[in-house]
Structures are given as structure tokens and as C-alpha cells.
From Swiss-Prot:
The keyword Zinc does not apply. Required for normal Golgi function. Residues 704-726 have a biased composition (Acidic residues). This is Conserved oligomeric Golgi complex subunit 8. It comes from Caenorhabditis elegans. It is a peripheral membrane protein. It comes from the Eukaryota. The keyword Protein transport applies.
Length: 743
């Protein structure tokens, strides 16, 4: 084509002119520029293509390089990938099997559904009382646990565990049958079902039954809390519940039941002896009795309890239980005795505080005490206070309060509380004397008040104590040989000692000593005072016996067995009224040997009298004797000369004794040797000094220490709280020492 064009152009060039050639030249030049432009565009486009190709080549090289690097470790991971595929295959197979198991389990005809309902059936059996079926289900649960292959299944494991754990719930439900009213036949069935349970010993069964009975007992006590007669109701509840439990226990657990040993126990281990069945029951009874006594004590703190009714009910309850082989009367007696002692001590302290706590002056009625009537009481009647006591209203109120406290002891008049009673009264009198000396020593009625306390109140309290606790009864109960003198010394409210031990003793002793000063027989006027009103009814209370050495003469005085209580009280009243101790120092220092017929007066002098040694009194104590009414016998002898003949005396012996008495009065310089009227006095046989009262508590403690009493339940002469330092710690004083103190 180009050759054709060039050919034509050559023809044209030859044929065209210059203008035309110029025009063609311009056209060619423009076409050349267009071609150059196209060439430039083509060159530019080719460069971009080359650049893109280069970048693509670089990227491809990089990509292939990375691929090469990654494919290098692919061979190393091929083994791990293979094992992962194998594991995946196994899991897929297991999942397929489980899927198949679930599909079978969803079938309602599968026995697994019955197995899953066993826990709920177990609960229904327990609540409905089908204890035999419940026990069978628990045994089935144990069998499932023993089958290892089945127990590995989570469903079966859960069911088996629930059935076994329900055994504790079954036991609790069975034992709860005892936490309510008892039915003996039903209770026996329950115990038989409980005995089927393994790993439950006989003692555990007994203790569990008693514990659930305590739960029921506590529920009943809570129901009556706050009632007015709560204590009486509580005692009745304790009695009924404990009796029912005792009957059930003896019916279910007989005494002759043989306790079997555990065959699985290793004989090489140390084994403790098995307790007998009754020991558990006894300890349970004692524990409940202690709870009941604690309940009574707490209730008594809030408000006073009628201890008389409580004592009666508790003793009746203890007696009924004692017939069944469980006697807890010593425990009740010990606890209630302490409670009664505490109440008596508190009542006396309150009465004393009411008297001494008032800041009022001592106000008394201005009546001459001599114009007041004198009361005489029958031998067996309660003592009557002196009429002078009614002149002081505050003291009358105090005395009545103490008498009320003593009357509160009527239902438990045991010598065990005697020490507490005496100590409380002594402390009360001492507090009153201290109050008078510290607050009312300047009062116009101070001396009169002290006299009333010393001569009216204290003797009246002594009579009350002796009336409530007769010496003969105390000696009979304890089998003691304590004489009446020792007993009266023990309960004596010694005003001299109390006055000396109180604060402001100097002021009190100035008044007490003259009141209690002993007077001679001549000062008293014994002939007029002791003159018998009915001589025909009076009988001598002493007799003389002949001895081998002395022949007809003096013998030891012996108290007649038929001596009445009235004669004893007459002696005591005369001693209190006249302040005279008929056992003078003369009779205290005389030896117990009879006086020989030809004994000279020099043998009775002071130098030849036997020395008084208190420490030897306990070695050879004389035969105990009752206090004698010496003054009455002397008066009868003075007014009835025939009495000497009745006593076996001769006129010669009478003259000798009169002369001896006269010599004693003349030669003796001791203050306690008083002048005696020979016309009215009869020589009294000398009485040896009796031992002091200190050994009483020891003897009684030894006598009763073997009693079956709970620990810390003492049955001795009083308790540890009732110590009296004045009597127990003081030795018997000789007449010489007494005279020195009186001076």
C-alpha cells in the first residue's frame, strides 16, 4: 500500500506545482507531528505495562517465597494432623454411642425411669410411715454402691447416694416418734426398726431415745413458762414424762439384756468396759432432776416459791421412782436444803435490814415492864416471847419476821440446817447490837433496847430453835451421844460474846455485863423463889447410891428416864429470869469422885483442887448428863426434912456436908464461889466438866459421809457456809479464866 501511495505521490509531485507542494509539505509536517504524538503515547503506555508487569512479577516472587517457606514445615506437622484426625474419629464414635444411649433412655419402657423415681419413693415411704420399705430401699442403695460398673454411671451413682443418705433422715424420723406422747406398742416397733440399722450400737440407741424424750420434755416446759403455778406444773410434767420414759426404757431395754461385743474390733486395741444398761438410765434421771432443781432455783430467785409444796411433790416423786430402782431423794434433799438455808438466811437478813436500816429514833411505850403479865407455856407448846418485847414495835416486827422464817422450816426440820439457823440468828443479833451502839447510843431508850435484845429477843430465839430442833430428836436421828448441855451450848446465843464482837462493844458491854452477871443464891432468895406450890406433886429428881468404898453416901447424879419436858423448861426459865447459873464454879471444879465420910475440910481447898485441862477433855470424856434442876431439889430439901431420909442420907452425913460447904465458902477467895445458906442448900454431887461442842460436826460428818449423795451434797452438821467461830473454835474455859474475864 505504501509503495502505491509513494508512487502516486511521485506522480503528483511531478505534476503539482510549488504551492501545492508547500501545502503538501505542511500537511506532511502535521501528520508527522501526529505520528510523533502517537508514538509518544504508545511509548508511555508500554512503560506502564512494563512497570505493572514488574510489580506483578515482584509480588509473585514474594508470594511464592512465602509459600515455599510454609510448605517446608508441612511435612513435620503431617503426623500431628494424622493423630488429631484419629482422636476426632474416636470422639465422634463416643458421641454417637452416647446419642444412642440417650435415645434409648428416652424410651418410656426403659427401667432407668423406675430407678430415677427411687429417691422420691424413699421420701414418701418415710413420711407415710412405711419404715420397712424405706429400710429395704436403703439396702438397695448399698447394693448399687457395691457394684462398681453400675456405680460409675452418674445417674445410678446419684440415685444410690441419695438412698444411702436417706438413712439418716429415716433414723431421725424414727427417733422423732419419741419426741411426743408415747404409745408403748408403737414405740417397740420403732425401736425394732432402728435396731436394723448398721453401725448403731446399743448405747447409742439408748442415748438417742433418751435425748429425744428430753426434747419433748423441754417443749412441755416451754409451754407452761410464765404461768402462776409453773413450778408445780413443771414437777408434774417431769414426773409424768420421766415415768413414761422409764416404763418404755425398761420394756425395750430389759435389765438382763446381753450387750454384744463388736466382732470387727481389733482385740489388740484398748477397750473400755461396756456400761450396764441401768447406768445410762440412772444418769439420765439424775440429769433431769438437776435440771428440774435448777428450774426451781431460778424461779425462786424471781419470786418466792412454796417450798413446802415443792418438797412434798418432789419427795413423792422420788419415792415412786425409788420403788422402780432409781432413788434420788438424797439429791433432792441436799439441793432443797441449800435452797431453804439460803432463803432463811435471806429472810433474816431482810428483817435485820428493815430494823437497822431505819433512821428513826427508838420509840417505846412507856409502861413499866414489871406490870406486864407473865406467860406460862405448856411443856409441848410453842415458846412465847416476853411481854416486854411488845413495848418496842420495830423489834416486834423484826421478831415476827424471824419467827415467820423459822416457821418456814417446819417441813424440813433436819439438823442439817441447824448450824445455818444458829449462825444467821447470831449474825442478826450482832448486827442489831452494832446498829444500836453506832446509831442510838445517845438515845434515852438505848439501855432499854439493849436489855430487850439480850434478855427477851435472844432467849426467845434460843427457845424457838430448841422447840423446832429438840435435843432428844437430834441425838436419835444421828445416833449421837451428845448431851443436852452440849446441844444447848451449841445453839446458845451467847450475848457476852456477841456484845464483845460487835462494833461499839464498849457501849454494849457496859449494859450487858450487869444484866448477865450471876447472882448468889442468897441474893436471889431461893427459899421464896423455888418454894413449891404443890409439894405433893413434886418428886425429887436425884437419888444417892451406896458405893463399895464410901458406903452409904453421895453418888453420881443420874437423870431419871421419866423426867418431863416441863421440868427441863422450868429450869431454863428460872435461869433466864434470875440470871443464875446453878452450876456454879464450885460444882465445875469439884471432882467426880464421891466425898468420903471422914474427909477433912483442908482437902477441898483451892490448892488441892485438880487442875482444869481443856485439852484432855476429849481423851476421857465423862458420861454425858442432862442439865439438872438443882435449885428445885434444894428448895424441896430445905422445906421437907424427910427428903434426906428418902435419899438415903443420915443426919451425920448431912452435918459433914454442911460443914464442908461452910469451909469451902470461908476458905475460897474465887469470885465464883458464892455464899450458900446451909439451911436451904443440899450438897449437890459434883459434876465433871463435859467436853466442848467442837467434836459434834466431825462426828456427824463421819456418820453420814457414806450416804449415796451426789458430789458436793453434804449431810453433816450444817454446811460450809454456816461456820460459827465463837463456839467451834473456842476451848472450854475454866472457872478461874471466867472470873478473870468477868473482872
Amino acid at each position: 500500500m505504501d509503495s502505491d501511495y509513494i508512487f502516486h505521490n511521485g506522480d503528483d509531485i511531478r505534476n503539482m506545482g510549488l504551492e501545492e507542494m508547500r501545502r503538501q509539505k505542511v500537511l506532511l509536517a502535521s501528520e508527522l507531528k501526529a505520528i510523533d504524538a502517537q508514538i509518544s503515547d504508545l511509548a508511555f503506555n508500554n512503560y506502564g505495562t512494563y512497570a505493572d508487569a514488574g510489580r506483578a512479577t515482584h509480588d509473585c516472587s514474594k508470594t511464592f517465597g512465602e509459600m515455599r517457606d510454609k510448605t517446608v514445615n508441612l511435612s513435620d506437622q503431617a503426623e500431628e494432623l494424622t493423630s488429631a484426625f484419629v482422636e476426632f474419629r474416636a470422639k465422634a464414635k463416643q458421641l454417637s454411642e452416647e446419642q444412642d444411649l440417650v435415645r434409648k433412655a428416652l424410651d418410656k419402657s426403659n427401667p432407668i425411669w423406675e430407678l430415677l423415681t427411687l429417691p422420691s419413693r424413699m421420701d414418701i415411704c418415710i413420711r407415710a410411715g412405711y419404715y420397712d420399705l424405706a429400710y429395704t430401699l436403703t439396702n438397695y442403695g448399698l447394693q448399687l454402691q457395691q457394684q462398681t460398673q453400675l456405680y460409675r454411671n452418674p445417674l445410678i451413682k446419684k440415685v444410690a447416694d441419695h438412698l444411702v443418705e436417706a438413712r439418716a433422715y429415716l433414723l431421725e424420723e424414727l427417733f422423732n416418734k419419741f419426741a411426743g406422747p408415747l404409745d408403748l406398742a408403737e414405740s417397740i416397733k420403732v425401736v425394732n426398726n432402728v435396731r436394723k440399722m448398721p453401725s448403731l450400737t446399743a448405747n447409742q440407741l439408748r442415748i438417742a431415745v433418751l435425748q429425744h424424750r428430753d426434747i419433748y420434755l423441754e417443749k412441755q416446759i416451754l409451754d407452761i413458762s410464765g404461768n402462776v403455778d409453773m413450778i408445780v406444773q413443771a414437777i408434774e410434767i417431769y414426773r409424768t414424762s420421766m415415768y413414761d420414759t422409764l416404763v418404755l426404757y425398761l420394756a425395750v431395754f430389759p435389765e438382763n439384756e446381753v450387750v454384744r461385743k463388736n466382732p470387727n474390733a481389733d482385740p489388740r486395741w484398748e477397750s473400755w468396759p461396756v456400761l450396764p444398761p441401768n447406768s445410762i438410765l440412772s444418769q439420765w434421771v439424775i440429769s433431769n432432776v438437776k435440771k428440774m432443781l435448777d428450774l426451781i432455783t431460778k424461779a425462786d430467785v424471781k419470786s418466792a416459791v412454796d417450798l413446802s409444796a415443792v418438797w412434798t411433790k418432789l419427795m413423792a416423786m422420788a419415792s415412786s421412782f425409788g420403788r422402780m430402782g432409781i432413788d434420788f431423794r438424797p439429791l433432792i434433799a441436799g439441793k432443797l436444803t441449800k435452797l431453804i438455808e439460803q432463803r432463811f438466811r435471806q429472810n433474816v437478813q431482810e428483817a435485820t435490814s428493815r430494823l437497822t436500816g431505819s433512821s428513826r429514833d427508838i420509840v417505846m411505850i412507856g409502861i413499866d415492864p414489871a406490870s406486864l403479865p407473865q406467860f406460862e407455856t405448856a411443856p409441848d407448846s410453842p415458846p412465847v416471847a416476853a411481854a416486854e418485847l411488845s413495848l418496842w414495835d420495830d423489834m416486834t416486827i423484826y421478831t415476827n419476821s424471824v419467827v415467820d422464817a423459822l416457821n418456814g422450816l417446819r417441813f424440813i426440820l433436819t439438823p442439817v440446817v441447824l448450824s445455818t439457823v444458829v449462825v444467821s440468828l447470831r449474825d442478826s443479833i450482832r448486827s442489831i447490837l452494832t446498829w444500836l451502839a453506832s446509831s442510838h447510843s445517845n438515845s434515852a431508850n438505848f439501855s432499854r433496847a439493849v436489855r430487850i435484845v439480850c434478855t427477851s429477843v435472844a432467849p426467845f430465839f434460843e427457845k424457838c430453835v430448841a422447840f423446832f430442833f429438840p435435843p432428844a430428836t437430834v441425838s436419835k436421828i444421828f445416833g449421837s451421844s451428845i448431851s443436852k448441855r452440849q446441844y444447848l451450848q451449841f445453839i446458845e446465843l451467847d450475848m457476852k460474846q456477841l456484845a464483845a464482837s460487835c462494833d461499839g462493844a464498849e457501849k454494849i458491854e457496859e449494859i450487858v455485863k450487869p444484866l448477865l452477871q450471876k447472882r448468889t443464891l442468897e441474893e436471889i432468895g431461893l427459899e421464896n423463889v423455888l418454894k413449891p406450890t404443890k409439894p405433893e406433886e413434886e418428886k425429887t429428881k436425884f437419888f444417892l447410891e451406896e458405893t463399895v468404898e464410901d458406903g452409904p453416901g453421895l453418888a453420881e447424879p443420874q437423870e431419871e428416864a421419866s423426867e418431863s419436858v416441863k421440868e427441863q423448861e422450868t429450869t431454863s426459865e428460872l435461869e433466864k429470869k434470875h440470871g443464875t447459873d446453878f452450876e456454879t464454879a464450885e460444882t465445875q471444879e469439884m471432882v467426880s469422885e464421891p466425898v468420903k465420910e471422914h474427909e477433912t475440910t483442908s482437902e477441898l481447898t483451892k490448892e488441892q483442887e485438880p487442875a482444869f485441862e481443856p485439852e484432855k477433855l476429849h481423851e476421857t470424856p465423862p458420861e454425858p448428863m442432862e442439865p439438872q434442876n438443882f435449885g428445885e431439889s434444894e428448895a424441896k430439901a430445905a422445906h421437907n426434912p424427910e427428903a434426906h431420909l428418902e435419899l438415903g442420907e443420915t443426919s451425920e452425913n448431912q452435918e459433914i456436908r454442911e460443914q464442908e460447904h461452910k469451909e469451902v465458902v470461908i476458905t475460897s477467895t474465887e469470885p465464883e464461889f458464892h455464899e450458900i445458906d446451909l439451911n436451904s442448900a443440899v450438897l449437890i454431887p459434883k459434876i465433871a466438866v463435859e467436853p466442848q461442842l467442837d467434836p459434834i460436826s466431825e462426828y456427824l460428818t463421819e456418820l453420814t459421809q457414806d450416804d449415796p449423795i451426789e458430789e458436793e451434797e453434804g449431810w453433816g452438821w450444817g454446811d460450809d457456809d454456816g461456820e460459827e467461830q465463837e463456839i467451834s473454835s473456842k476451848e472450854v474455859e475454866s472457872p478461874k479464866e471466867k472470873c478473870k474475864k468477868d473482872d
